[in-house]
Amino acid sequence: MKVLMVEPGKVPYAAEIGEGLEPLQAAVGGDIQAVYPYDDPVALICNEEGKYMGLPLNRALRDDEGNIYDIVAGNFFLCGLGEEDFTDLPADLMEKYRQQFEHPEQFVRIAGKILAVKQPVPSPEGRISGDRALFLQGGAAGRNAAGRVHGPGL
């Protein structure tokens, strides 16, 4: 079955998972839980005990207004829905959810509210891309000889 695999700290990728319960459990590292947070015919399959096991927090689930209502812990994948079983994730939905989950997230609690901070996406060459790339890699924006942070807008 073709799925979109989403691992903590990594960009999502297309994967092939075998049929039956055991391959599904292996993909998420334990008992599975299927949730249906979207109007599209997709299931999000995660580890049912991921939070209790202390698995790394992965991605936030948001409501229609963009507010976080849950955070998935550990690996999860998205697959299609058949009449009575899970199926291949169609190519258009694969791309839609790849874009939605493209950036790994870190989570912080500020004033009692949990915020998701999108992380830069490594390029295929292993370089960080995005506006903060130069700063994070110590390029033109970084620390000067005295150890002070400098660069555009800093």
Regions found by a protein language model. Give the residues of each.
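Helix-rich interaction surfaces within compact, conserved domain-sized segments
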Residues: D70-G80
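Non-Sec secretion/translocation targeting segments of pathogen effectors
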Residues: P124-I128, L136, A140-L154
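Short, extreme N-terminal segment that most often corresponds to the first beta-strand
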Residues: M1-A14, G18, P152
